[in-house]
């Protein structure tokens, strides 16, 4: 079996990161799916393909919460955290070859990092933009994206309009600003180790000091 591995939400300031692996006996199994990188697909296309992939392929996912990411980052880099999670889904699928989207400027080094977390032999093919090159990684990208979108939807029901969770999203930043204004601390779903959060907190502290004096 071969598998593809990708993640969604790596750079998000709110909510979890999702790592997904998709295993197939051969690439012919998914040749007719019309797979592409999840970012090139509409939400409805992703949902349709998600159902098809889950039905026809072996799938493994790992969901890492914001609090867990903060805890990991006290001990390792984010890239190492992703590599560990990639290894977890690879171990669950137990393929002979795993294609991974490299989370390192050096894809060969990233392959070695992932391999170091595996206890069973597996050939790791690590490349940048693997989600655009290998359909099996595109499939993993779709599973990761849809799974994360569903997790964000659950959080929005509980916490209100949080946007996509990414620092580039004005709705996400507006939510963070409003929450910190009211509670003086970041929300539980925020990655407190992110510079976005520390910068907003620093601005609020500076603003409070200025008004005091």
Curated annotation (Swiss-Prot):
Residues involved in a divalent metal cation binding: 6-7, 101
Keywords (A to Z) from UniProt: Cytoplasm, Endonuclease, Hydrolase, Manganese, Metal-binding, Nuclease
Subcellular localization(s) per the UniProt record: Cytoplasm
Co-factor remark: Manganese or magnesium. Binds 1 divalent metal ion per monomer in the absence of substrate. May bind a second metal ion after substrate binding.
GO CC term (a single one): cytoplasm
CDD domains from the UniProt entry: RNase_HII_archaea_like
Entry-linked InterPro entries: RNase_H2_suA, RNase_HII/HIII, RNase_HII/HIII_dom, RNase_HII_arc, RNase_HII_hlx-loop-hlx_cap_dom, RNaseH-like_sf, RNaseH_sf
EC number assigned by the record: 3.1.26.4
Top-level taxon: Archaea
Its biological purpose: Endonuclease that specifically degrades the RNA of RNA-DNA hybrids.
Similarity-based family: Belongs to the RNase HII family.
Name of the protein in its database record: Ribonuclease HII
Lineage of producing organism: Archaea, Methanobacteriati, Methanobacteriota, Stenosarchaea group, Methanomicrobia
């Amino acid at each position: 079996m071969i598998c593809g591995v990708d993640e969604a939400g790596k750079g998000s300031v709110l909510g979890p990161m999702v790592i997904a692996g998709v295993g197939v006996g051969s690439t012919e199994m998914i040749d007719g799916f019309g797979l592409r990188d999840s970012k090139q697909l509409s939400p409805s296309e992703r949902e349709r393909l998600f159902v098809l992939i889950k039905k026809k392929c072996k799938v493994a996912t790992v969901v890492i919460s914001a609090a867990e990411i903060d805890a990991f980052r006290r001990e390792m880099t984010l890239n190492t955290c992703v590599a560990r999670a990639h290894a977890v889904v690879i171990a669950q699928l137990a393929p002979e070859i795993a294609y991974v989207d490299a989370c390192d400027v050096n894809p060969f080094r990233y392959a070695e990092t992932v391999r170091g977390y595996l206890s069973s032999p597996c050939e790791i093919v690590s490349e940048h933009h693997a989600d655009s090159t290998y359909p099996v990684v595109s499939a993993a990208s779709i599973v990761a994206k849809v799974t994360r979108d569903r997790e964000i939807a659950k959080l929005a029901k509980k916490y209100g309009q949080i946007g996509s969770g990414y620092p580039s999203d004005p709705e996400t930043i507006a939510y963070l600003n409003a929450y910190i204004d009211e509670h003086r601390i970041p929300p539980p779903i925020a990655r407190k180790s992110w510079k976005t959060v520390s910068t907003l907190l620093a601005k609020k502290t500076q603003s409070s000091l200025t008004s005091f004096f």
